[in-house]
């Protein structure tokens, strides 16, 4: 019998009316804004603030293969397992971006029998949040160019406009463009460019805001560029923060959906973890904490990216601590980090598994540096052999690391019971959570701390441009912001071919970006791009739609 695709499994699943899912966690009709039968937004003003809030479980991973290691799948499956054990639980995830869906991923709502539904809706447009963010971002670009055209009262230096347009698509041809061409009636000519929507500062702001008032305040602080005398120009100078917030008034509301097994799921926001902070919205997580005893959430890519930013940016801004952290590992990723070529990962190779464990070990040790005990979820794949699995379990035993074989892709929540029990045990223990660095440290010291403590590097080199920016940012009073590293997800270093757990390498910061609205400084390393490109054979080639409107090819 042929193995069913994720989309086929999703289509065979019976969804419950969204009102029934809402009642399960105490969401009243007044707070529920349905988008059809199976999706809704939540009016956060109608959610009662609880004195005792739910505990947060963070799911992260080891350094992934290009196909990913099933972190979203494990996150959903763990929540379903808690549900099976009769715990009051909600899962909180990021929204998928269209670009990667059509590029390499083909979708991002979990997999197998651990998915959030309706899968095709969530992967394609969902409730319109990304379109609203794209519109708000590009409206700001239009306001900037109009200001230049109408006389430039603020004295904006058109060579130093930092704000770029965005599109929710992987489109390398738009990285560098010229705008305002065609004569004086068409605007002021200048160089511009596009980022992908998930890299927009407005995406980060929406995910770090607590309410509309906070959203507007953060938007007003966005630095869009500089004058010829290097004075920062903000959105508040343009006086358009109200208009931009108006565009986002519905997008800020968390989205309610469900898993295959009927566990409530809040899916909201979607910044990438390699070029942004990689976590779902604070509002969704806090709403889930007010509704449930346990909130299972994830942060993008490995512990060096999404989890580091969760700990030092999101948790700091939101004011909560994770009660447990799950590190997802797979046999195939261990073999890749042990030196096996990507086209040979399906073959048994105990030596490669043993060699690749250094990568997992560093991720486990990274989590311990935050004062939280990690639990390894060994996410089972069809080509794993008993000997390879036993090898990983023996390593965990020898190193006193909690581990659970996780089979949620195949079995849904039932395949995550062992993991749920392990996580619940850790949640009952006192954790000594701490941030990696203090905000009062200089920017370069915070960057060096991340590189040395989390990545295993020995030195940070700053380009001449980055050195000038460090000086300027300090003069502007921006040196107490947290750091958001932009780095490859495939390696601890800034070289994606350097696998395993490299030591004594150097990382170069080529450029810094001040996200004064979101409240962090982005440090760009290596060849990281904020507008990805499509692969030679994008996933879109396998996608279609039937005559009656059913999706084909999402996975």
UniProtKB/Swiss-Prot annotation:
GO terms for biological process: tetrahydrofolate interconversion. Gene3D superfamilies: Domain 2, N(10)-formyltetrahydrofolate synthetase, Formyltetrahydrofolate synthetase, domain 3, P-loop containing nucleotide triphosphate hydrolases. The keyword Ligase applies. Transmembrane segments: none annotated. ATP binds at residues 65-72. GO terms for molecular function: ATP binding; formate-tetrahydrofolate ligase activity. Its EC number is 6.3.4.3. InterPro entries: Formate_THF_ligase, Formate_THF_ligase_CS, P-loop_NTPase. It catalyses: (6S)-5,6,7,8-tetrahydrofolate + formate + ATP = (6R)-10-formyltetrahydrofolate + ADP + phosphate. NCBIfam families: PRK13505.1 (NF010030). This is Formate--tetrahydrofolate ligase. It comes from Staphylococcus epidermidis (strain ATCC 35984 / DSM 28319 / BCRC 17069 / CCUG 31568 / BM 3577 / RP62A).
